[in-house]
Amino acid sequence: MNISCSFNERLSSASSIVLSLWLSLTGLAAVIGNAAVLWLFHKNEPLRTISNRFLASLCVADFLAGLVVDPVYIAIRVFVQPRKDSILLKVIHMVWIYSTAATVFNLCCVSIDRFIAIRFPFRYQDIITKKRCYAVIIMVWLSSLFLPLSRVLIDNNPKTVEEMWFSLSFIFFEFPITVVTLCYFWIFKTVRKQTRKITVERHQTDCADTLPRARQNQKAIKTIGFVLGVFIFSWMPSLVTTVVSYVTADECLRNKLNFVVWPWIAAIGLTSSAINPGIYVFRNGDFREAWRRHFHWFS
């Protein structure tokens, strides 16, 4: 028995306005926030540590997402909807893939760098040299550039395109979520162990200098919670939606996910580019101090 599935593939006027306003504000925040971080990184020599170079690479990816991907997404969802077989849609898909890959791969690099810094503090400078840092960053951007070619090499058959997105979803979401979660799980364990050790030392020696270290560790634990929470909130819906769309046999459900649900899921993922500077950078004391020096009128 055929069940009719009737819905409008275009967003309603109210939904279009809300989505446009949402992506405009988050895109502007991503551009301004990440541009400010990159400017501070460029102007302040003490900020150019190896760890901060990974953060700078992440900021470049988030800056490009706010500058290019957000406006393009507003255009195709609100104003002009390209045909499924058009070259324009392929180009838009390539831009989306490139931006998403660059963001999530750089997030993985930041997470792995922090894991090594906390897990192996005395060997960190030997493991993560400046040369290796640049090599990893270059590899991230080259691999991000390579992945969009998958959209060029396949035809416009809906089933083939769906299989491509399903495969990419595991590269973009499953792999990074696993890496980030494992890294911050081990960081959390290490920080908790250090905090307990500091607490014991404080009770035994009543030494006042253990208090700042304890507070620093508590702040690190809070940062871990923010990082994992925002990452999972931003990207997990994309993975779930892609998987459900691929495995379901209900054509009506698949179309509703693609045309009704996906625009909002994509907007959530793009919002992370505006949030990342606040989590990864402005919780960093050195960056906050540089911000106060250069933008004292704003602070």
Question: Where do the language-model regions lie?
Answer:
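Helix-boundary and loop/linker segments of multi-pass membrane transporters
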Residues: 8-16, 44-48, 81-83, 125-129, ...
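Extracellular TM2-ECL1-early TM3 structural module of rhodopsin-like
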Residues: 12-24, 50-110, 117-125, 162-166, ...
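Hydrophobic alpha-helical segments of membrane proteins
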Residues: 67, 71, 146-149, 222-244, ...
